[in-house]
Amino acid sequence: MRLPVTVKATKPSFLVIWIRYSSAASSPTVSLNPSGRLQQTLAGSVEVKGKSLHSGKFSTVKLNPEIAGAGRFFEFRSRFIPASIEFAQESPLCTTLLKDELKIRTVEHLLSALEAKGVDNCRIQIESESSDDREVEVPIFDGSAKEWVDAIQGVGINAAQNHDGESVEKMVAHVNKPVYVCKNDTFVAAFPALETRITCGIDFPQVPAIGCQWFSWRPIHESSFAKDIASSRTFCVYEEVERMREAGLIKGGSLDNAIVCSAEHGWMNPPLRFDDEACRHKILDLIGDLSLVSRGGNGGLPVAHIVAYKAGHALHTDLARHLTMD
């Protein structure tokens, strides 16, 4: 069994990524192919409540089983908002879904867990503290996706059936030609590959405790996400906290739901769960954002080698849009 590896580099140009892919790829940039697996859903419902990161308000989320072909979608104020790239809106430090003037903020950790655990069809009921709110935020918990993975594993997963009581094969996007999006020296790219792999790099030269990190991961088996990615927590630089609060962000942020690193003093709330926890969390976010490629209960994360460097939610979702253009 091949385990995930961390590649340390002082400069990103020192990282050489070898990608194997077939030269006989079909002409479309992305094709939807059978996966050999059935669409799945939850075996029952599960409800959780928690504080949100940016608004600081509490919200309640109930995950429910859904029929094959329904896909993943939120229910807020009796309206349905599909967890689809068509409804993604650019917002600072999180991914937001917008439909009919209703907003669901910070969806990435929950969607990452659902995508990685194979919950293809799910009705996500969400309620805010106030019945008058036009927007609501998914709870942050400890800043990772561990709470969501525990909830999913606790209730279990079944094959989903359609209205006729039949199982439906899950289709998955295959990248046939390289696709990339970039801004200045940051980028996200998807290359043709025989299997799904994500390679991520971050670089914080002003924060030595973080520095330059690379991590490469692939879903080897069902427990890979829970073991390698899910428990990695969101992180921030201490010197940027006040600026974020002045911008109306991280009102619910604390040392209990994020790992905080100071340029001068290093990590302020150790121990880390992984030496490269910050880089792993970027992969967690990327999986959640690319889950928005999913439609009709099919896979969101494509069969491709996805390589990201210093990227954030805006670039992640931009790549997702490019992957759904054909």
From Swiss-Prot:
Organism lineage string: Eukaryota, Viridiplantae, Streptophyta, Embryophyta, Tracheophyta
The answer to whether the entry has keyword Kinase is no
Q: Which UniProt keywords apply?
A: Hydrolase, Lipid A biosynthesis, Lipid biosynthesis, Lipid metabolism, Metal-binding, Mitochondrion, Transit peptide, Zinc
Function according to Swiss-Prot or TrEMBL:
Involved in the biosynthesis of lipid A, a phosphorylated glycolipid that in bacteria anchors the lipopolysaccharide to the outer membrane of the cell. Lipid A-like molecules in plants may serve as structural components of the outer membranes of mitochondria and/or chloroplasts, or may be involved in signal transduction or plant defense responses (Potential).
Gene3D superfamilies, from UniProt?
Answer: lpxc deacetylase, domain 1 (3.30.230.20), lpxc deacetylase, domain 2 (3.30.1700.10)
Any idea of its EC number?
A: 3.5.1.108
What residues span the transit peptide? 1-21
**What GO annotations for molecular function exist for this entry?**
metal ion binding; UDP-3-O-acyl-N-acetylglucosamine deacetylase activity
Compartments it resides in: Mitochondrion
Chemical reaction(s) catalysed: a UDP-3-O-[(3R)-3-hydroxyacyl]-N-acetyl-alpha-D-glucosamine + H2O = a UDP-3-O-[(3R)-3-hydroxyacyl]-alpha-D-glucosamine + acetate
Q: What is its main location?
A: mitochondrion
- Which biological pathway? Glycolipid biosynthesis; lipid IV(A) biosynthesis; lipid IV(A) from (3R)-3-hydroxytetradecanoyl-[acyl-carrier-protein] and UDP-N-acetyl-alpha-D-glucosamine: step 2/6
One Pfam family cited in the UniProt record for this chain: LpxC
State the name under which the record lists this protein: Probable UDP-3-O-acyl-N-acetylglucosamine deacetylase 1, mitochondrial
| Binding positions for Zn(2+) per the UniProt entry | 109, 281, 285
Q: What's the miscellaneous note?
A: Plants silencing LPXC do not have altered morphology compared to wild-type plants when grown under normal growth conditions, but they do not accumulate 2,3-diacylglucosamine-1-phosphate.
What family is reported? Answer: Belongs to the LpxC family.
As cofactor, the record names: Zn(2+)
- Which gene name does the record give? LPXC1
Write out the GO cellular component annotations. membrane; mitochondrion
Give the GO biological process terms. Answer: lipid A biosynthetic process; lipid X metabolic process
Q: Transcription regulation as a keyword?
A: no
